[in-house]
Swiss-Prot record:
Keyword set, alphabetical order: Aminoacyl-tRNA synthetase, ATP-binding, Cytoplasm, Ligase, Nucleotide-binding, Protein biosynthesis, RNA-binding
Record family assignment: Belongs to the class-I aminoacyl-tRNA synthetase family. TyrS type 1 subfamily.
PANTHER family: TYROSINE--TRNA LIGASE, MITOCHONDRIAL (PTHR11766:SF0), TYROSYL-TRNA SYNTHETASE (PTHR11766)
Name used for this protein in its record: Tyrosine--tRNA ligase
Length: 407
């Protein structure tokens, strides 16, 4: 069996490592436990997390055990990494609900049976800590001077960094130590924005336990312009079908830029690299075939083959004019009494767009269509005349479609 390190390297996941040669040898010779942390600030994971799930799945296929750590304790503080403002604190009930949602989504590609993977909540140990003991046992190993040079704190120093958030690095380092002691977890993985926090945990274990510990970060999922992927006009691209429908999810990947196809095939599908290279080499109109494969494969992983097939059929029906298959498109249902209202109000009511200001912005940019006619009037009223045999068709941009059916 190939060393999973080589697989991760070839597919382009790895960004930084603490001990490259040691890690390669370790992953090739032993079966280890490793962990990735998830911040439970929403009740669904999104595309940014999906890349982490893929790394976990590759590692598990090679015989290593993933530990999904949900930050029920640290989530009550908030990770300052990449943030310019302090985030709202969450209740225990919110965090517990979100943890349960995460496990269902992770289980789509991670096998949790027979302890092949486990999920833990750091609230189990962080919420019961004795502050004085924590400072004496853990705090003594952290240099404030060194912490202030970490990227995750730099951007916050000018605006103000609370002592609450300053503790986050200690908490995350302690998580790694706790997992090392309980589960013999020897490696922490995370996005490259977590590098400083990961180093803190590796260093803490080496100091406290006199044992080897390792860290690895992977690239963030960005497009060819360096912007994070997974953002739509409606917000984040969620893995929960109630938040982002399988059709919208499929369409997002079907419409990625040509320059991003190869990267996405490598990072968020399990297609063999020979097939990735073949699809990525297609040019001109043929690249659309690669995009269809990408969209189908990613949707299948998250929503299952049946939903992926439905999304594919709906997309083809839309462009091929096959109305009977439009039922798989994101559809909102309204009452006749909802007619004779402003289009911008209707779009928000049907959750097609998050706000009226967003709808007006889209109209101003010339990117909103009603029954395939460009909308130019901010005060357009939707009447019975707009209701076709297939309903009211809404298009955002070139390829994002929604349907409103009047019941």
């Amino acid at each position: 069996m190939s060393n999973v390190y080589d697989i991760l390297k070839e597919r382009g996941y790895i960004k930084q490592l603490t001990h490259e040669e040691e890690i390669r040898e370790l992953l090739g010779k032993e079966k280890i436990s490793f962990y990735i942390g998830f911040d439970p600030t929403a009740d669904s994971l999104h595309v940014g997390h999906f890349l982490q799930m893929m790394v976990m799945a590759h590692m598990q296929k090679a015989g290593h055990r993933p530990i999904a750590l949900v930050g029920g304790g640290t989530g009550m503080i908030g990770d300052p990494t990449g943030k310019t403002d302090m985030r709202k604190m969450m209740t225990k009930e919110q965090i517990e609900h979100n943890c349960n949602c995460f496990k269902k989504q992770l289980a789509k590609i991670i096998d949790f049976s027979e302890d092949k993977a486990i999920m833990v909540n750091n609230a189990d140990w962080l919420l019961n800590l004795n502050y004085i003991e924590f400072l004496r046992e853990i705090g003594v190993h952290f240099s404030v001077n060194k912490m202030l040079t970490a990227e995750c704190f730099k951007s916050r120093l000018e605006k103000g960094l609370s002592f609450l958030e300053f503790n986050y690095m200690l908490m995350q380092g302690y998580d790694f130590l706790e997992l090392n002691r309980k589960y013999n977890c020897v490696m922490e993985l995370g996005g490259d924005d977590q590098w400083s926090n990961i180093l803190a945990g590796v260093d803490l274990i080496r100091r406290k336990e006199s044992k080897s510990a390792y860290g690895m970060t992977f690239t963030l999922l960005t497009n060819s312009e360096g912007k994070k992927m997974g953002k739509t006009e409606s917000g984040a691209l969620w893995l929960d079908p109630e938040k982002t429908s399988p059709y919208e999810f499929y369409q997002y990947w079907r419409n990625v830029a040509d320059a991003d196809v190869e990267k996405c095939l490598r990072l968020i599908t399990f297609l063999p690299m020979d097939e990735v290279r073949r699809l990525s080499s297609l040019e001109g109109a043929e690249i659309n075939e690669a995009k269809k494969v990408l969209a189908f494969e990613v949707t299948k992983l998250i929503h299952g083959e049946e939903e992926a097939q439905k999304a594919k059929i709906a997309a083809e029906a839309l462009f091929g004019g096959n109305a009977k298959d439009l039922g798989n498109m994101p559809t909102a249902y309204i009452d006749k009494n909802d007619l004779n209202n402003l289009l911008v109000d209707l779009l928000v009511k049907c959750e097609i767009l998050p706000s009226k200001s967003e709808a007006r912005r889209l109209i101003k940019q010339g990117g909103l269509y009603l029954n395939d006619e460009k909308v130019t009037d901010m005060n357009l009223v939707v009447t019975e005349e707009h209701v076709t045999e297939d309903g009211i068709m809404i298009r955002r941009g070139k390829k994002n479609f929604n349907r409103i059916v009047v019941e």
